[in-house]
Amino acid sequence: MPYCTSLRQHNPKIYDLFESIPVSSHEHELFARYIKNNTEIEGHLFTPKAEIEGFEDIDGLIRKYNSRLYYKHIGRRIEEYKNYLYIKSYVEDSTEIIKKLQELASSGVSQYTASVDSWISRESYTIDDDGKKEALRQMFADSHVALIYGSAGTGKSTLIKHISNFWADKDKIFLANTHPAVDNMRRKVTAGNSEYNTIAKFLSKRNNNTDCDVLFIDECSTVSNDDMRRVLEKANFKLLVLVGDVYQIESIYFGNWFSIAQKFVPETSIFELTHPYRTTNDNLLTVWDRVRKLDDAILEPLVKNSYVARLDESIFEHGEDDEIILCLNYDGLYGINNINRFLQNSNPNESVVWGINTYKVGDPILFNESNIFSPLIHNNSKGKIVSIRPEKQQIRFDIELEESINGIDAWGYDFELIGESETGKSIISFSVNKYRSTDEDDEDNDSTVIPFQVAYAVSIHKAQGLEYDSVKIVITNETEERITHNIFYTAITRAKNKLKIYWSPETEQSVLGRLEVKNSTKDAHLLSRLSSITMTS
């Protein structure tokens, strides 16, 4: 069924399928694709049968599709409940996750609050605000699971650190979907007895380290239902800490569990952080708040504070040291590739060509996933090129880091700590070979791979977890339909001080007019009835 299934890691575009395979006799596949897209892209677990347009004999299409499924793919069946259609495995995953969370929330840890108070007093431990302190005191008093919700910059990672310090002598596992999120926790958390992994690595067959006292999962909105269910089935833990923001970029695959979970567990398991620390700029905070809540007056503070501008060549002016341009597309005049190329050409320093890439002193960079300096210098760490010395067989870079490290930190890594910049940031030096040695068997430590990318501009998705003093966002008419509420909110909350959104008046109207917060209430009610699980709100 080529119109609704594909080989692993091979997902052809729909228009390529149309050009290759006649549509006749494949209507049941197109219908299944519609239901799948309405779930995975639009985020609706249940699709109202009455609202489906463009298909005839829906019941017949469902029967034909279900009858042609491979027997090991029974979870892909389309089923019906009270005139709503759903995919069997997605409902089953949601149900099992919610039931496990309800089980964990049914009882707390004996004498928990008293033990936290005693620890804070005994260690003279300082917590940066009363909200986090109270959350830590109550977190496991009545529950074995804590769901921590917070918008960008409210200190979710800091609260993870406080929880970890309290449980310092217990075994802890920290999981997240992306390497930057894992590395961020590794940097923030200094408590011992800690293991860090991506969810993919944790779920791999080779990983047997699944037992712990406390399991932490960060950026939960990016974790799919399928992955979350498998984590809960594989991990053996006593306490569970789930952290995220339902308004940030969601899972690539279907993942609604974190948004609906708060409707099924008691309030004693839910903690929300509201005070922002990323910026003290009241104008920015107003914009963030209005976009988050989809206030009718979103445009007013954007215009009043000159946060919007016509899309023109002024986007190519690089005005700040700590500045990034965020885009959705890589190609085109206002795509990431062209903006990076143009701004690098505007850099007056000498070009150094190495392989297919060009580098200049002064180029801003981001360390990437081939970064051999992790975890000290994590994936997506910012930096700046301060020296380039090409030779016949290798090239040497001096990079100013975004922060300061010391000689003990740097011990054991394949770089030299050579000094510090005028602003007190560390400068490291390392070389990259032109050719691989015949002794190199490890693909992960290829000495010819440059561990960073030039980053005048990056994608909005890659920028999640980063922050810059100045942020410019480019939205063209080609990408406006892909700007969801979550993507727009993620983009604007990367800024600490200055924000500028470049778009045409037509694109501005289109984007702001289409923004909507995904409402999971209806899905939660239907799931509750279908699976006989009790809602709490």
Segments from the language model and where they lie:
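Conserved RecA-like ASCE P-loop NTPase motor core of nucleic-acid helicases/translocases
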Residues: I148-R187, V243, L299-R341, S351-T358, ...
